[in-house]
């Protein structure tokens, strides 16, 4: 972790100078490191980020449907996208983690990085106001907002369901066939049953949702052949 004297370097990377550096320090503190951690700031930042991105998409795509707007927002505020931003900022170098998380590589774990990004957004809001925070966040998201489009925002499960509905076929059925690993690092195996396919297709991932999406993506490929 970077020494505290290098926090100004992080401020330059973020593009924001904190009046109250303690807020940034708080945002970088994981629950494993102290009783006063960043989860409340994360909660606040999550809501503010949603407002900022929702507003930006609403004005950027005046003809987009509610469903398209929701899917684009989900893409932009998902944990993977937030972690991507956090890694660009090298946030892992500045996080305050407990010994256990340090040992297990928490400074490079996507979920921890993503949570810290949301906490920083919350901290910036408390240190300034909504408009300053909006300007900062939109700067972080500039290229992402420029490239995102309503098309191709539907996830594989939605696409598979719509395809089958178009053919007036039964909807797919997803079944969990295996769960392995400890609670914090489980692997899910999902089978997707589609009438059009002779055998179920299988998806394996770190969450049930991801496994279902992988299975649905495979089913789509097979049906379209």
Curated annotation (Swiss-Prot):
What is its subcellular localisation? Cytoplasm
- Keyword annotations from UniProtKB, A to Z: Cytoplasm, Endonuclease, Hydrolase, Magnesium, Metal-binding, mRNA processing, Nuclease, RNA-binding, rRNA processing, rRNA-binding, tRNA processing
Q: Which domain of life is it from?
A: Bacteria
What's its job? Digests double-stranded RNA. Involved in the processing of primary rRNA transcript to yield the immediate precursors to the large and small rRNAs (23S and 16S). Processes some mRNAs, and tRNAs when they are encoded in the rRNA operon. Processes pre-crRNA and tracrRNA of type II CRISPR loci if present in the organism.
Q: Which GO terms describe its molecular function?
A: double-stranded RNA binding; metal ion binding; ribonuclease III activity; rRNA binding
Organism from which the protein derives: Shewanella woodyi (strain ATCC 51908 / MS32)
Q: Tell me where in this chain the RNase III domain is found.
A: 7-129
> What name goes with this protein?
Ribonuclease 3
- Residues of the active site are 46, 118
Annotated GO biological processes are: mRNA processing; regulation of gene expression; rRNA processing; tRNA processing
- The broad enzyme category this protein falls into is hydrolase
- Which cofactor names does the annotation list? Mg(2+)
- InterPro entries documented for this protein: dsRBD_dom (IPR014720), RNase_III (IPR011907), RNase_III_dom (IPR000999), RNase_III_sf (IPR036389)
Listed CDD domains: DSRM_RNAse_III_family, RIBOc
Q: Which residues form the DRBM domain?
A: 155-225
Looking at the UniProt record for this protein, which Gene Ontology cellular component terms does it annotate, in alphabetical order?
cytoplasm
Report quaternary structure and partners.
Homodimer.
List the catalysed reactions. Endonucleolytic cleavage to 5'-phosphomonoester
Q: Which residues bind Mg(2+)?
A: 42, 115, 118
